[in-house]
Structure formats: C-alpha cells, structure tokens
C-alpha cells in the first residue's frame, strides 16, 4: 500500500517550470500612429471637435508608439456605426466579433509556439487562455482546443476580464501547473482585440481617449513545462511568482462591461502608484537571491504607457537600455494588455541571440517580469535565463 506522501512525490516534477517556446501574432490591419488621429476623428464623425482632436494628437505624439495592429478595419466600423459613438448600445455586435476572432487569433499564436516547440500537440496537457475581449460559454479555451485539435482530456482554465497584469498571471499559473503535475506541458495563450473597447471620443471622459491612443491587438502563446527533454529547447526558467494589490490604489484602473462595450477608467496618478510600489515588489522577489542592484537584472515590464516607464526608470535609477525590449514592443505594437509581456519575452530572447549575447536575458542571468493593471494589481515573476 502506497502512502499519500509517495503519491504526492510521484505527481511532482523535479526541476523548475521552464518556458519552452513562444509564438506571437497580430491582425493584418496596421495603423500608423502619426496619422491615426485624422483617421479616428473621421471614422467616428467627430472632426468638428477640433480642440479634442488636438488633445488626441498630442496624446498619440507622446505615446512613443509608431504603429499598432487592429482587427477593426474601416470597413467593419462602417458596418457597425454604433462602435463609433461614445456610448451607444453595441455589446451584442461587439461580442459577435470577439467570440470568433479572439480564439482565432489565439490559435495562430499557439500554432507558432507549437511549431517552435517541435513536439506533437498531443503532449499538451493543460490550456490556460486569457482575454479581456469578450465573454462566452463554453469559452475561448474550449474554442481554442477545438481549433487546434487538442485532446478532449486536456485540462482547461479560462481567464476573462483580468486586464493588463494578466500576462504575469498566466505564467504564475503555468508554473504551478507544470511543477505540480509531472510531465505536464502547459499551453498559455493571451489574445486581445480592441473590438470591445473601441469607441468615439468624449470631451468629458478624457481617460477613455487615453485608451484609444494606446491599445492595440495581438496574441501570444507560450509553452511551459518542467524537466525538459533533450528534444526541447529551454528559453527561460520561472523561479518565483507573486501577486499583490498596491495600497491606496482602489479605482486607479477600472474596466466595466456594459451595453456599450468595455469602458476603461484610468486615474492620472497610475504612473506614480506603480513606481511607488515597484521597489517593494522587487525587494520581496530578489532578497532571497541576494540581489539588490536593479541594473544587474534583465527587465520585462508591461508597457502601460510611456509615463509609467519613465517614472519606473527614475524611481529605480535604471539605465535607459534596461527597458529597451519593453519600449520596442510598445513602439511596434502599442499596449496589447495581457499579451504585451509575452511579446517582450519573445523580443528579448530573439534580440539576445541575434546580438550574440551569452544568455536569452541580454547576457544576464536573472530577470524580472512585471505586469500591472486593474486593482491596482501587480504581478512579479522572477526569471532565470539560459545560455543562447
């Protein structure tokens, strides 16, 4: 007769959870940030709001974004004029698009990750799907399982309405799943499209306009497993993961699903809330490792916007190159909510390899991944790079 302890030991992996592959994808429709204000005010029939357009132009100019990708084309918006008003009932039409396109975009990212992984998809044991775009039952996790042809016994977890911090959340969950289920291979997918948040401008709700200047569409997929086989190629190890609520931050970032779609509300002090709490998170994560020099680690930070990155840099005394990968993804894609940090992971390992650096983490051994969003919730993941 075996004991419970023996069963528990047999169920667990020996080594740490490891990222084994990353895939990213965007919709085909690309919008140029410099000309976006003209397009946005024209398509929303708001060209008469000249002062508001000038404000929006300044927001776009200061965003540090060069381009974004969006599923919503001019043709789709003309077919759905309610999307272009500020507060028109439109949830049904938005949902009709989101419940189809979110898993479809996620499938493309997953196929890219599975191809890099190089193993049969039948080895995938768990699926974690995350989106802030649309809600359905059965969910996008179910649709993805069907689209990819995964085994019906795959264990699924669906995360809806989490927001920008959730790229860290999915890695934290995948770490626990991989380390507590021997042989597990976890497919995590973050798929975000702005069909639920796009809306016309309002002169009384400028925080909504900030979102229109920043958000873009994209999907990222990552395969996580412990104890890699010789055929698998590790990219990063997931060493520890934590989540915390920033004190005195209630209402800093809110999202509400209504008949008009998903409305976002941002307070102006979000950059200071993040920067004032980040050092405590870093200390708690890295103190066990004896690390206190924040320039000695590689950085993957959710790029909520340029003001947040600037304040984090100033608060921690980071060298400009520390947030290179983060700023690059913000520039090339905008804020893709939960998918952003996974895009940054992909950018970092590719740039590190192309530059001939010694590790996947820009030649450094240890790194940190930060996600932050509604709550204000902060996710902190400690990463260990591998040789390139």
Curated annotation (Swiss-Prot):
It catalyses: (E)-4-coumaroyl-CoA + 3 malonyl-CoA + 3 H(+) = 2',4,4',6'-tetrahydroxychalcone + 3 CO2 + 4 CoA. Disulfide bonds: none annotated. Its EC number is 2.3.1.74. The keyword Nucleotide-binding does not apply. Pathway: Secondary metabolite biosynthesis; flavonoid biosynthesis. The keyword Acyltransferase applies. Gene3D superfamilies: 3.40.47.10. Signal peptide: none annotated. GO terms for molecular function: naringenin-chalcone synthase activity. The active site is at residue 164. Pfam families: Chal_sti_synt_C, Chal_sti_synt_N. Keywords: Acyltransferase, Flavonoid biosynthesis, Transferase. It comes from the Eukaryota. GO terms for biological process: flavonoid biosynthetic process; polyketide biosynthetic process. Belongs to the thiolase-like superfamily. Chalcone/stilbene synthases family. The primary product of this enzyme is 4,2',4',6'-tetrahydroxychalcone (also termed naringenin-chalcone or chalcone) which can under specific conditions spontaneously isomerize into naringenin. This is Chalcone synthase DIV. It comes from Ipomoea batatas (Sweet potato). The gene is CHS-DIV.
């Amino acid at each position: 007769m075996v004991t419970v302890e023996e069963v528990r030991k047999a169920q667990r992996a020996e080594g740490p959870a490891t990222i084994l592959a990353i895939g990213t994808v965007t919709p085909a429709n690309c919008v140029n940030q410099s000309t976006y204000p003209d397009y946005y005010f024209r398509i929303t029939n708001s060209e008469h709001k000249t002062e508001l357009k000038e404000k929006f132009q300044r927001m776009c100019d200061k965003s540090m974004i060069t381009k974004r990708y969006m599923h919503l084309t001019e043709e789709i918006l003309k077919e759905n004029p309610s999307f272009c008003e500020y507060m028109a009932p439109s949830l049904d039409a938005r949902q009709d698009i989101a419940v189809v396109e979110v898993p479809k975009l996620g499938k493309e990212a997953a196929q890219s990750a599975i191809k890099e992984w190089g193993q049969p998809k039948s080895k995938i044991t768990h699926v974690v799907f995350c989106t802030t775009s649309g809600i359905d039952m059965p969910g996008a996790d179910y649709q993805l399982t069907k689209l990819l042809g995964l085994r019906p016994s795959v264990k699924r977890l669906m995360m809806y309405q989490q927001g920008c911090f959730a790229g860290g959340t999915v890695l934290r969950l995948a770490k626990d799943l991989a380390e507590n289920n021997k042989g597990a291979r976890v497919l995590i997918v973050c798929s975000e499209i702005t069909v639920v948040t796009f809306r016309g401008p309002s002169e009384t709700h400028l925080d909504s306009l900030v979102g229109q200047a920043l958000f873009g569409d994209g999907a990222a997929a990552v395969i996580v497993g412990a104890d890699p086989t010789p055929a698998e190629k590790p990219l990063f190890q997931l060493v520890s993961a934590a989540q915390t609520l920033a004190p005195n931050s209630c209402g800093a970032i809110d999202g509400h699903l209504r008949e008009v779609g998903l409305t976002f509300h941002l307070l102006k002090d979000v950059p200071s809330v993040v920067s004032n709490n980040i050092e405590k998170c870093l200390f708690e994560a890295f103190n066990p490792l004896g690390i206190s020099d924040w320039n000695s680690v590689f950085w993957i930070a959710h790029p909520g916007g340029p003001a947040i990155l600037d304040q984090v840099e100033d608060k921690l005394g980071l060298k400009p190159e520390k947030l290179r990968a983060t700023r690059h993804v913000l520039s090339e894609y905008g804020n893709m909510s939960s998918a952003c940090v996974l895009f940054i992971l992909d950018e970092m390992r590719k740039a590190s390899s192309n530059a001939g650096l010694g590790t996947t983490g820009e030649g450094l051994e240890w790194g940190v991944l930060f996600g932050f969003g509604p709550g204000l919730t902060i996710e902190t993941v400690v990463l260990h790079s591998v040789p390139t």
